[in-house]
Amino acid sequence: MSDFVPGLEGVVAFETEIAEPDKEGGSLRYRGVDIEDLVGHVSFGNVWGLLVDGAFNPGLPPAEPFPIPVHSGDIRVDVQSALAMLAPVWGLKPLLDIDAAQARDDLARAAVMALSYVAQSARGQGLPMVPQSEIDKAESIVERFMIRWRGEPDPKHVKAVDAYWTSAAEHGMNASTFTARVIASTGADVAAALSGAVGAMSGPLHGGAPSRVLGMIEEIERTGDATAYVKRALDNGERLMGFGHRVYRAEDPRARVLRRTAKELDAPRFEVAEALEKAALEELHNRRPDRVLATNVEFWAAIMLDFAEVPAHMFTSMFTCARTAGWSAHILEQKRTGRLVRPSARYVGPGTRNPREIEGFEDIAG
């Protein structure tokens, strides 16, 4: 029997051509292209094309003018439900019954609808929908999203969201991507795989940490002393959000490109964030010189999204939008392998027992 590996950590379950997180060198490449060369240079819609097709064009198409059919008051619930409903509405067929070209087209249609649904749900029912004629004036997928959500977005905010989505578009075998591949491996339709991935993303251990960085920033703005805050937090056994990563043994490359972009866009909280980062890295190194605890993507993602006036409760939804690119690429790659993902579990429960040994048997036995 194979060795038991809790959480499957370190287990190689797939071979992929999509992304290469270089944990030692602190770099992240999408099909060989470093994200340093993508963020701020190639828009998210074309990065979707790179990840899915290996080419920038045609990229992600505009979303179809389809109103979101669910209004629960929770963006994740709305998007996850609405995605699943695309299958009967559009007549999506199981991946098992279609070829790769059809799967790719289905993924493009469904993935961009996820962005549309996030924007529509975030706008809410209290405001009228933005006319399609206004949305069609946009020059990029990200700008279309922002117009659908807000009506007239600040161009700098569009650049900030584009940078974040590109940097967070794909990151190898994480929980939501694994979920998408498992569902795809069953031969289910693409909407089912995307919907399942959205559910996995909703867990705070995967998609919920960036919003927690803002609390630290706000406290330092109040006190004006980043070093004192860091020392007090660590002395109290608190975790500094935005530092350390399970993959990288060097600085998270996504943090690096988002820091650069935040400075280029003159984000108001850049200096406070930079002071916190410097104080945290110095104190963490002093206390744990044997460990590499560098800045991760969550830290500067929070600064970028805050700059773009994205409310904290939407941070996970924005992460979801970004990761639709990686999910789409992995779903298509899994479709091409054609192999069902079926790991094993080692039984460690009780041995053979008589029902009479189970508590409550006397109450239910006839």
Where are these regions (language model features)?
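Hydrophobic alpha-helical bundle cores within soluble ligand-binding/oligomerization subdomains
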Residues: 1-366
